[in-house]
Amino acid sequence: GAAPFAAEGAMSDLRAVFSLQSEVFTILARRDANIASFDDLKGKRVGVGAPNSGVEINARMIFEAHGMTYKDVKVDYLNYGEAIDQMKNGLINAAFVTSGLGNATIRELGVTKKIAFVPVDGEARQRLIKKYPFYIESTIPAATYGTASDTPTAAVMNILVADKKLPADVVYDLLKNIFSPTGLETI
């Protein structure tokens, strides 16, 4: 979404160097809230991320793809740590998190509370990807958080960017070191 960054204008001096890990869009729900699908969020108290954060912008786009708005839920603007705490304390029913797979905070929540993962799939996911092509299809494998089955979702890729004035030999050396056997072993 360009809207939150419109005032700053295009960053035409940046160049993509390579893709890093994907940031998976995860919708967590307390199991006792009976939320199995996105539509089940209607009327529930939902943590959508801090205002204008990446998580919150993702949440707005995903609501839109499902034909819903924040008016359909009781929104709490919480960063994901706050949202997890609110879920632990029974103060919200669901939370949106954008992170790499295996997030320690999500794992910890799963140890202390019974949680479910809400899928982002079907036509809604296809609408999301069509309108915002920086999203990709993704899956949260069952083994990641000990769920009964994989959860379909969407993700965005983290990308290392550099100023276009950075000399090509510096970029080459960086990539050579990162993707060398030693570099890969280190990361």
Language-model features and meaning:
Residues 41, 87-88, 174:
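Hydrophobic residues within well-ordered alpha-helices
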Residues 1-43, 47-50, 117:
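Short, glycine-/small- and polar/acidic-enriched structural segments
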Residues 179-187:
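Periplasmic-binding protein-like
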Residues 9, 66-71:
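Short helix-capping segments at alpha-helix termini
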Residues 63:
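Conserved hydrophobic residues forming the short capping helix/wall of the S-adenosyl-L-methionine
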Residues 2-4, 33, 69-167:
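Pocket-lining segment of extracytoplasmic ligand-binding domains
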Residues 53-59:
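Secondary-structure junction motif
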Residues 167-177:
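Short amphipathic alpha-helical coupling segments at ligand-binding clamshell hinges
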